[in-house]
C-alpha cells in the first residue's frame, strides 16, 4: 500500500512539469496550442491536454533572407 501511495504522489507531481515542457517546446518554435491545425499550418509538436502545436507553413518562393542568383554569374543546372 505504501508503494502505491508513493507512486501516485510521484506521478501526480510530475504531471504538471511534463505539461509545461510540452508548452515550452511549442513556444520555442513560435507555434500555438490548438485543437486542430489550419490549412496553412503543420503539426510540429504536442501540447498539454491533447492539444496540437501548430506552426504556419512558409510559402514556397523567394524569401527576404535568400539572395537572388540574378547577376551572380552562376548558371543553374537543369535536368
Curated annotation (Swiss-Prot):
The gene is Defb15. Has antibacterial activity. Belongs to the beta-defensin family. The keyword Oxidoreductase does not apply. Expressed in testis and to a lesser extent in epididymis (caput, corpus and cauda). Also weakly expressed in kidneys and colon. Keywords: Antibiotic, Antimicrobial, Defensin, Disulfide bond, Secreted, Signal. One of its GO terms (cellular component) is extracellular region. It is found in: Secreted. GO terms for biological process: defense response to bacterium; innate immune response. The keyword Disulfide bond applies. It comes from Mus musculus (Mouse). Disulfide bonds join 26-53, 33-47, 37-54. This is Beta-defensin 15. Gene3D superfamilies: Antimicrobial Peptide, Beta-defensin 2, Chain A (3.10.360.10). Residues 1-20 form the signal peptide.
Amino acid at each position: 500500500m505504501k508503494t502505491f501511495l508513493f507512486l501516485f504522489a510521484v506521478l501526480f507531481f510530475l504531471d504538471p512539469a511534463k505539461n509545461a515542457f510540452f508548452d515550452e517546446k511549442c513556444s520555442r518554435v513560435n507555434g500555438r496550442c490548438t485543437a486542430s491545425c489550419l490549412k496553412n499550418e503543420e503539426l510540429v509538436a504536442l501540447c498539454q491536454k491533447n492539444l496540437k502545436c501548430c506552426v504556419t507553413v512558409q510559402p514556397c518562393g523567394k524569401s527576404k533572407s535568400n539572395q537572388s542568383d540574378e547577376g551572380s554569374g552562376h548558371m543553374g543546372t537543369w535536368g
